[in-house]
Amino acid sequence: MFRIGQGFDVHEFAEGRPLIIGGITIPYEKGLLGHSDADVLLHTIADACLGAIAAGDIGKHFPDTDPAFKDADSAVLLQKVWEFVREQGYELGNLDCTIIAQKPKMAPHIESMRKRISELLETSIDNINVKATTTEKLGFTGREEGIASQAVVLLQKK
């Protein structure tokens, strides 16, 4: 049996925070605002995985009202989600992600993100695709106010 999940997340830029996307710290003058480390891509992937098994979303499992998750490492959160997915009897078919950002340029970091995500999801890098696009200076991402991401995951029963 196959299950498909879709994820979407948005975070606004904030001064004085590191920019962490896909488990990788990216040199930039701003980071993303959030209760955790605000890794927009890993949050999106977690939501896609949870959606595929009809288990809600990241906010249900790691609420931003819980001080235990303040400044949490999103890689650890994704690992917990993935452990839960595997306990339900699923493994990864493939994952396709899109980062939507005017700046900074993501291309130099894509392969590092793919590698890190493949480690977190215990799969071959060949099952992970990460790409980036801009909105041609339209909307909040085009005005460089934040970053969005989308992901689609295919899970298969072990």
UniProtKB/Swiss-Prot annotation:
Catalytic activity: 4-CDP-2-C-methyl-D-erythritol 2-phosphate = 2-C-methyl-D-erythritol 2,4-cyclic diphosphate + CMP
InterPro entries: MECDP_synthase, MECDP_synthase_CS, MECDP_synthase_sf
Signal peptide range in chain numbering: none
Cofactor(s) annotated in UniProt: a divalent metal cation
Listed pathway(s): Isoprenoid biosynthesis; isopentenyl diphosphate biosynthesis via DXP pathway; isopentenyl diphosphate from 1-deoxy-D-xylulose 5-phosphate: step 4/6
Free-text cofactor note: Binds 1 divalent metal cation per subunit.
Matches recorded under Pfam families: YgbB
Residues annotated as site: Transition state stabilizer: H35, T134
UniProtKB keywords: Isoprene biosynthesis, Lyase, Metal-binding
CDD domains linked: MECDP_synthase (cd00554)
Binding site for 4-CDP-2-C-methyl-D-erythritol 2-phosphate: 9-11, 35-36, 57-59, 62-66, 101-107, 133-136, 140, 143
Record-listed E.C. numbers: 4.6.1.12
Family indicated by similarity: Belongs to the IspF family.
Alphabetized NCBIfam families for the sequence: ispF
Cross-referenced PANTHER family: 2-C-METHYL-D-ERYTHRITOL 2,4-CYCLODIPHOSPHATE SYNTHASE, CHLOROPLASTIC
Quaternary state and interactors: Homotrimer.
Protein task: Involved in the biosynthesis of isopentenyl diphosphate (IPP) and dimethylallyl diphosphate (DMAPP), two major building blocks of isoprenoid compounds. Catalyzes the conversion of 4-diphosphocytidyl-2-C-methyl-D-erythritol 2-phosphate (CDP-ME2P) to 2-C-methyl-D-erythritol 2,4-cyclodiphosphate (ME-CPP) with a corresponding release of cytidine 5-monophosphate (CMP).
Protein name per UniProt: 2-C-methyl-D-erythritol 2,4-cyclodiphosphate synthase
Organism expressing this protein natively: Bacillus cytotoxicus (strain DSM 22905 / CIP 110041 / 391-98 / NVH 391-98)
Gene, per the UniProt record: ispF
